Amino acid sequence: MSDEIIEVPCPICQKSVPWTNESTFRPFCSKRCQLIDLGEWAAEEKAIPSDTADFAMDPNVSDEWSIK
């Protein structure tokens, strides 16, 4: 096994981050960058692309799980 340490860029500030167990916030360089990223997800500035869910297509369609 190689002793080479892989480094990745922090997704927020692009600072180089070693990919080791000691890198507590990896892939982020710091708690600050980790929280900035979390805030972007919470504010819906980021999203995982997907097809629209079937239940979201027609709000008038009811099923057994709908609140009545």
From Swiss-Prot:
Q: How does it assemble?
A: Interacts with GyrB.
Q: Where does Zn(2+) bind?
A: C10, C13, C29, C33
What is the scientific name of the source organism? Haemophilus influenzae (strain PittEE)
What Pfam families does the annotation carry? YacG (PF03884)
Q: Which InterPro entries does the entry mention?
A: DNA_gyrase_inhibitor_YacG, Znf_NHR/GATA
Name the cofactor(s). Answer: Zn(2+)
Role of this protein: Inhibits all the catalytic activities of DNA gyrase by preventing its interaction with DNA. Acts by binding directly to the C-terminal domain of GyrB, which probably disrupts DNA binding by the gyrase.
> Which GO terms fall under biological process for this protein?
regulation of DNA-templated transcription
Q: What does the record give under GO molecular function?
A: DNA topoisomerase type II (double strand cut, ATP-hydrolyzing) inhibitor activity; zinc ion binding
Which domain of life, per UniProt?
Answer: Bacteria
Its name, as the record gives it, is: DNA gyrase inhibitor YacG
Its family remark reads: Belongs to the DNA gyrase inhibitor YacG family.
SUPFAM superfamilies from the UniProt entry: Glucocorticoid receptor-like (DNA-binding domain)
| UniProt gene name | yacG
Q: How is the cofactor bound?
A: Binds 1 zinc ion.
Which keywords does UniProt give here?
A: Metal-binding, Zinc
